[in-house]
A protein has these predicted regions:
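Typically the conserved alpha-helix immediately C-terminal to a functionally engaged Cys/Sec
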Residues: 70-86
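Short pre-active-site segment immediately N-terminal to redox-active cysteine/selenocysteine motifs
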Residues: 56, 63-67, 110
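Short Cys/His-rich micro-motifs in 6-15 aa windows
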Residues: 31-40
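Non-catalytic, surface beta->alpha helical segment in thiol-disulfide oxidoreductase systems
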Residues: 110, 115-143
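A short beta-strand-turn-helix
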Residues: 40-59
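Short cysteine-rich clusters marking metal-coordination/redox-active sites
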Residues: 8-11, 28-31
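Cys/His-rich microdomains that often coordinate metals
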Residues: 15, 35, 75
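Short linker/helix segments within small regulatory modules
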Residues: 17-26
């Protein structure tokens, strides 16, 4: 059976798990917490690099800022969409005010901007607030 690498959303440990169409249980080998967590994780520069470099599943990153009205409007939709992708994609949020180096690295000029990373590379991006349905449809193309 083939395996996929998944970064734990709780402790950041890299786990190799059997590749399946769906999962009922999958726990981190280090912290023993669930890898099925769908709540978007908050990233700093180190955790961003770890998630993007070590995940075989797509990493969907919302670049946002606390002063951004459309970012605040989209947050519930981003969380709702994330719930559909347990171990199919990892959803994460990166505050462009506190992690400016990563935002600059990817040329973030407007927010919210959502980027999908796979195999340590950007594969697509969208800018502007999106609904949960729009996000889910967009992310599904890369699963």
């Amino acid at each position: 059976m083939s395996r996929i690498k998944v970064v734990c959303p709780h402790c950041g440990a890299v786990n190799a798990i059997p590749k399946k169409d769906s999962y009922t249980k999958a726990n981190c080998g280090k912290c023993h917490r669930s890898l099925l967590e769908t709540k978007p994780i908050d990233l700093d520069e180190v955790s961003f690099d770890n998630q993007v470099a070590n995940s075989d599943i797509p990493v969907v990153v919302d670049f946002w800022a606390s002063w951004c009205g459309p970012c605040k409007m989209m947050a519930p939709a981003f969380e709702e969409s994330a719930a559909s992708f347990a171990l199919k994609a990892r959803f994460a949020k990166l505050n462009t005010e506190s992690v400016q180096s990563v935002a600059a690295r990817f040329g973030i000029r407007s927010i919210p901007t959502v980027i999908i990373f796979k195999n340590n590379m950007e594969i697509d991006r969208i800018s502007g607030a999106q609904s949960a349905a729009q996000l889910t449809q967009w992310v599904s193309r890369f699963i």
